[in-house]
Design a protein with these regions (language model features):
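A short, structure-level motif marking secondary-structure boundaries and short turns
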Residues: 34-35, 131-134, 176
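N-terminal helix-rich structural modules
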Residues: 1-117
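An amphipathic alpha-helical core segment
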Residues: 93-157
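Acidic, proline/glycine-rich low-complexity IDRs
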Residues: 145-177
Length: 177
């Protein structure tokens, strides 16, 4: 295992989380806009994760451990300023999942993010939009009747359970704004 790379990925993901939490708890994380502070963190992380993936490919469990693998996924998942890069990462993550190097739920989230950014219906129902009343609603879903089966296969909770959790987070966010 590459402990140095693992530590770097964990540090990058932690900075992302801490920045988001700080903005959220101070009421400075906008719902419909991109925080300039968060943007700076993402730009820095994007530049570095691109170099890491170019050098190592997808950073799977054997290379950086489960937590390092998840940290890399978080960084790519949050690379919303770089949709082409996210799209390029999908086949890399697909290969990692097939090899047992990454969990399917990570691929589900990334695929859905890429589909949403392309204006296409998502497969797993992981992406949400804000409604006019300030609540999150699932972004359009392909074959919605079977979404829970796909979610179950990926190790995700049902849409109902997930939407309930998201709405609880919305309430906390709305209290801060």
């Amino acid at each position: 295992m590459n402990e140095e790379l693992r530590a770097e990925l964990l540090s990058m993901a932690e900075e992302d989380r801490e920045t988001r939490d700080k903005l959220l708890h101070s009421g400075q994380l906008p719902k419909n806009n991109y925080s300039p502070v968060m943007k700076l963190v993402h730009e820095k992380n994007n530049a570095r994760i691109k170099k890491i993936i170019e050098q190592f490919g997808w950073t799977g469990k054997n290379l950086v451990g489960e937590d390092g693998c998840e940290a890399a996924w978080i960084i790519v998942q949050h690379a919303v300023l770089e949709p082409d890069f996210q799209r390029q990462c999908v086949p890399l993550l697909e290969s990692a999942v097939a090899a047992g190097e990454a969990p399917l739920w990570q691929l589900a989230y990334l695929k859905d993010r890429v589909l949403k950014m392309s204006g296409e219906p998502q497969l797993y129902g992981t992406q949400y939009d804000w409604s006019e009343n300030g609540k999150s609603v699932p972004y359009k879903i392909h074959d919605e009747a079977n979404v829970d089966a796909r979610r179950r296969e990926a190790g995700l909770p049902t849409m109902e359970e997930n939407t309930k959790r998201i709405h609880q987070e919305d309430e906390l966010l709305n209290e801060k704004l």
